[in-house]
Amino acid sequence: MGLELYLDLLSQPCRAVYIFAKKNDIPFELRIVDLIKGQHLSDAFAQVNPLKKVPALKDGDFTLTESVAILLYLTRKYKVPDYWYPQDLQARARVDEYLAWQHTTLRRSCLRALWHKVMFPVFLGEPVSPQTLAATLAELDVTLQLLEDKFLQNKAFLTGPHISLADLVAITELMHPVGAGCQVFEGRPKLATWRQRVEAAVGEDLFQEAHEVILKAKDFPPADPTIKQKLMPWVLAMIR
């Protein structure tokens, strides 16, 4: 059995892994794990990833979890352009720096924006208070400013003149609040231009394919009560 990727494109790290593999012509079998149906919580999936999270990778008898680890594994196993994860010590360190920063900052803010603005009221039927939503969106705005000031600055991409894993991970995160109807790029011309560069670099068709699900988040039907009961503890733990 060749490379298998366990993904749901509703998930932002899954989108990053999917885009990277497709863009670099890495052959893989796609194994869909439907988060909305709670398939990631099943005993069957726990055999692949006991943490019950996506993405997950299976390469023969070898399994791997965590999106950054998976992306790095793919850069090392397959012949991909150097700019994704440069050999140059300091250029690579810049990518590492962003990947270390984003997990508890941009990811948290973008995830909370999606769930508080759309997924709780629409999918789970549990509206959040206006105060909570306002605080979530304010936190997102602060994080976006940090992204611009610390990482993008006046560069073409987050870590230099070429796209890297940092940009791919960042853009897939930012499309979460976009899917919730947040005007993430409005009033931020540098960030908006950067998005256009990233989209062009990965290919517009692939970019749209990967984000088709999240851009329809507002149209999700209400969750079945049984699914809601199963998912709620997982959701609350995820966005806390």
UniProtKB/Swiss-Prot annotation:
Source organism, top-level taxon: Eukaryota
Domain GST N-terminal: 2-82
Enzyme class: transferase
Single GO term (MF): glutathione peroxidase activity
Disulfide linkage: none
Main localization (coarse): cytoplasm
Residues reported to bind glutathione: 40, 53-54, 66-67
Expression by tissue: Found in erythrocyte. Expressed at low levels in liver. In lung, expressed at low levels in club cells and ciliated cells at the alveolar/bronchiolar junction. Absent from epithelial cells of larger bronchioles.
Pfam families: GST_C, GST_N_3
Entries under PROSITE patterns matching the protein: GST_CTER, GST_NTER
CDD domains: GST_C_Theta (cd03183), GST_N_Theta (cd03050)
Reactions catalysed according to its record: RX + glutathione = an S-substituted glutathione + a halide anion + H(+)
EC number(s) reported in the record: 2.5.1.18
Keywords: Cytoplasm, Transferase
InterPro entries: Glutathione-S-Trfase_C-like (IPR010987), Glutathione-S-Trfase_C_sf (IPR036282), Glutathione_S-Trfase (IPR040079), Glutathione_S-Trfase_N (IPR004045), GST_C (IPR004046), GST_C_Theta (IPR040077), GST_N_Theta (IPR040075), GST_Theta (IPR051369)
Location in or out of the cell: Cytoplasm
Biological processes annotated in GO: glutathione metabolic process
Span of domain GST C-terminal: 88-220
Family per similarity comment: Belongs to the GST superfamily. Theta family.
Assembly notes: Homodimer.
Function (record text): Conjugation of reduced glutathione to a wide number of exogenous and endogenous hydrophobic electrophiles. Acts on 1,2-epoxy-3-(4-nitrophenoxy)propane, phenethylisothiocyanate 4-nitrobenzyl chloride and 4-nitrophenethyl bromide. Displays glutathione peroxidase activity with cumene hydroperoxide.
Name this polypeptide is given: Glutathione S-transferase theta-1
Organism: Homo sapiens
